[in-house]
Amino acid sequence: MKRMIISLVCCLFAMCGPAGADAPKPFPDFTFKRVKPPSTSQGPRITVQIGPKTGEPDLASASQPTSTPQDQANWFWSQISPDIGSASAGRIEGAVNHIQTTAANPLVAPRLADLQNIASTHNTDILRATVGTRVSPALVLAVIHTESSGNIAEQSSAGAQGLMQLIPATADRFGVADPFDAAQNINGGVAYLDWLMGQFDGDPLLVLAAYNAGEGAVREHGGVPPFAETRTYVPKVLMAWSVARGLCRTPPQLASDGCVFIVKGS
């Protein structure tokens, strides 16, 4: 009888099965796989590149201009060659004519009265500095207006100083002890322009590009460098030049021609 009861209990357990047998496995998709490390002679299999998160701007590219330099000043450089191989002292006339006649020109010509005020204040210093050089006083006046609007105390965030915005290295190079002294600053700026005239065959476009970006940048890029500021700077100074030469008793034709300003009291 006792054996019969034990047999009956065992049968009942066999029919029910273990508790929780029908419950899902805790990690049904989890499997173990043993992977051997690569041998020392085996090269890397995976290259991991970490980039900016999706939706977050790349800080390096976010600071770049939204349009290319060529787009910003294309109205000028599409017709006037920026290449160093096109260097010529005489092409200033065609460049100025293009500036004055193209409807696409976004630049605003400086007021004659503003240029006249600068000429009246610094006439003597400009004439003295340009004697015996290849730099027209009208070009100096145009550069001063573009760089500082005639403000002797002007100082840029990049460290350029004075009327013609000389950086310390250029000021030191051309013997300017006090860049905020008008006469010294003009002497240094004219000396630099004259030196650049000799470097770039008297081509005013390349000279102005080098004055803005450095002669090394012009040589490196084989002409006017593709910098937005420089590509805009050159036609801007040439536009000021076209107004400044109207203040000369005999308007200069080349950027190296002499000029005697018609100023108040003269």
Task: List each model region and its residues.
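Second-shell loop/turn segments in exported
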Residues: 109-117, 125-131, 151-157, 172-182, ...
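Surface-exposed patches in mature extracellular/periplasmic domains of secreted proteins
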Residues: 134-142, 182, 202-210, 249-250
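Short, structured secondary-structure boundary patches
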Residues: 125-126, 145, 152-154, 158-163, ...
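Cell-wall glycan-active module
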Residues: 2-133, 137-141, 235-266
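Substrate-binding/active-site groove segments that recognize
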Residues: 154-177, 188-197, 209, 216, ...
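Solvent-exposed coil/turn segments that connect beta secondary-structure elements
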Residues: 135, 146-149, 169, 242
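Acidic helix/loop microenvironments that form the catalytic cleft of cell-wall polysaccharide enzymes
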Residues: 144-149, 188-192, 202-228, 233, ...
